[in-house]
Amino acid sequence: MSKATCSFEGCHSAVITINDDNIINLPEQVHSEFKLLENRTMRDATPSESNFLVVPDVWDFDNVGVSREIPSSILGDLSDKSDFVFEYGNSSWKIKKCLKYLICADCDKGPIGIICKVQDQTKNEERVLHLLSLRSLQIMGRN
């Protein structure tokens, strides 16, 4: 199993063990839209999609910090963003609103992910998920 760690020099704190079944792809523009940190080596690769780890519960992390609520003036309304739809748990989910940022709990740097309100596109049910940007972290032990 691979581990996601903080990518900042002098930190490298373990953030979470990665479950490959919970990795989703979102469009490339998600990093600029949500103002997420990008690991320099990953940013230079310029892939067309970005991998995120879906984490259902904050207690599933080994070590993560959470910011204050993100003012809507920073990110705006996402209801018209049809690009931010992903498949997870046999459902199609749409990101409705970003609530808070995820940061490294040891060095307080980031943001390395977002806590989002998402909506199931078929059942019309809403829930909160943690989306951890794998491009914002260093991945150890990946084959």
UniProtKB/Swiss-Prot annotation:
Residues that, per the record, bind Zn(2+): 6, 11, 104, 107
Gene Ontology biological process: post-Golgi vesicle-mediated transport; protein transport; small GTPase-mediated signal transduction
Any single GO CC term annotated in Swiss-Prot or TrEMBL for this entry: membrane
Keywords, sorted A to Z: Guanine-nucleotide releasing factor, Metal-binding, Protein transport, Transport, Zinc
Segments forming domain MSS4: 1-131
GO molecular function (one): zinc ion binding
Keyword Zinc annotated: yes
Gene3D superfamilies: Metal Binding Protein, Guanine Nucleotide Exchange Factor, Chain A
Family: Belongs to the DSS4/MSS4 family.
Role description: Guanine-nucleotide-releasing protein that acts on SEC4. Might play a general role in vesicular transport.
Something else known: Present with 1500 molecules/cell in log phase SD medium.
Protein name per UniProt: Protein DSS4
